[in-house]
Design a protein with these regions (language model features):
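A short, flexible loop at the N-terminus of ABC-type nucleotide-binding domains that lies
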Residues: 1-31
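Helix-to-loop junction immediately C-terminal to a conserved catalytic motif
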Residues: 52
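Conserved ABC transporter NBD signature motif
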Residues: 57-76
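Q-loop/switch helix immediately C-terminal to the Walker
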Residues: 86, 91-107, 113
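Conserved ABC ATPase "signature" region
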Residues: 111-126
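Conserved ABC ATPase signature
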Residues: 130-137
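Hydrophobic anchor residue at the start of the ABC signature
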Residues: 144, 148
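ABC-family nucleotide-binding domains
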Residues: 158, 165, 169
């Protein structure tokens, strides 16, 4: 039996002048791990930005724990963790300070989990480096460490295994296995295929390409 939904999406419309991405999209996100599945160009990353409240839909509603993204955007966004790969906002920030910012923004931030993630993802040598100095894979590890520690109701992960080494992939898999048993938090994982051996709360098929 599914636990009560944390995030409700109803009649979501979003597109660009030359392409409609979503026309009347509706679904619910329940505690555990949900796969947002689709190929290149189908709008997976755009949908994550919509769910994060980083961009607004043309119409439709998004609610987390009955908080509307349109009516209470600040309260809505405070319940979401989302690290936008295209953002340069933290490029000059050290890894340690980035974690401090995330801790200040998320009331449920778990310092013990952060310490485990720093060790599990091999981030100790990079703690005092600015993000712009990091490789793509290491920067992705920083975002993942914050994601697993944040304690947010909704955590959004965009292709989390990309550019990771073997030990880091194993660590992420273990954390997602734990996340699948969550009763109060949801992880939304955007990827082409489901990660092996992870019990999914649901699968949302976005499609192979944009409409």
């Amino acid at each position: 039996m599914l636990k009560p939904a944390l995030l409700n999406v109803d009649a979501l419309h979003f597109g660009y002048p030359d392409a409609l991405l979503f026309g009347g999209l509706s679904f619910q996100i329940h505690p555990g791990v949900t796969l947002l599945r689709g190929g290149d160009g189908c709008g997976k990353s755009t949908l994550l930005r919509l769910l994060a409240g980083a961009i607004e839909p043309q119409s439709g509603t998004l609610c987390i724990n009955n908080v509307s993204a349109h009516e209470q955007p600040g309260v809505y966004r405070a319940q979401v963790f989302w690290a936008d790969p295209q953002s340069t906002a933290f490029e000059q920030t050290t890894v340690r300070d980035y974690f401090a910012v995330q801790s200040s923004q998320h009331a449920g931030f778990d310092q013990q989990m952060l310490a485990s993630a720093i060790e599990g993802l091999g981030l100790e040598p990079h703690i005092h480096k600015a993000l712009f100095m990091l490789s793509t894979g290491t920067k992705r590890k920083v975002w993942l460490a914050a994601a697993f520690a944040c304690g947010a109701a909704i955590t959004l992960l965009d292709e989390p295994f990309t550019a990771l080494d073997g030990p880091s992939i194993a660590f992420v898999m273990q954390q997602l296995t734990n996340a699948a048993r969550q009763t109060q938090r949801a992880y939304v994982l955007a990827d082409y295929v489901a990660p092996a051996a992870i019990a999914l709360a649901s699968v949302i098929d976005v499609g192979e390409q944009a409409a």
